[in-house]
Amino acid sequence: MNFVSHDKNKEERKLNIGCGNAPKEGYLNVDIGECSKDMFMDVTKPLPFPDETFTHIFAQHVLEHIPRESFFSVFREIHRILRKGGTLDFCVPKAGSDNYWTDPTHTMPFTDRTMDFLIEGKQLRENGVIYGADYAFTEIVIPQIDDVETLYFRLGKE
């Protein structure tokens, strides 16, 4: 797939981050594991795509595995490669749920308040270190789904 030469205004490009064994049709399916469908990719490193490449980015139960020290840089990169008017859909286990605590590879807990930092470009002080989001997503909708284990989010880029 060629991601450099395309008309940003016409062509839809979709990215599935952390596809695992569940690639999505019509998406570029990437994963850090050997199961990667289309491309091996470590999202904690700079992403190999030009600015505003994708109209839609999807990540299902991936972002809770991002190390804390990489959290803001990963979202900064997602924001960078998402086109204006594009959407980011993701779901993560709710902090404190059994789903969060039963997997020892979960490193980043999420709550509704976590999204404030992504949506409003806020800063977070933790253990004397200030982490900041120098970008802001637009909150499109946070569906009210009666699932006490998982949080679902849709963010946009204006």
For the regions a language model picked out, list residue spans one by one.
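Class I SAM-dependent methyltransferase "Motif I" SAM/SAH-binding loop
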Residues: L15-N21
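A short glycine-rich, Lys/Arg-flanked "PGG" loop and its adjoining helix->strand segment in the class I
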Residues: F72-K84
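A short His-aromatic
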Residues: H65
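A conserved beta-strand element that flanks and buttresses the S-adenosyl-L-methionine
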Residues: F58
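Conserved Class I S-adenosyl-L-methionine
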Residues: W101-Y131
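Conserved beta-strand signature within the Rossmann-like core of class I S-adenosyl-L-methionine
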Residues: G85-P93
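Adenosine-cofactor binding site in Rossmann-like domains, unifying the SAM/SAH pocket
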Residues: N21-P50
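Core SAM-dependent methyltransferase catalytic element
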Residues: E139-E158
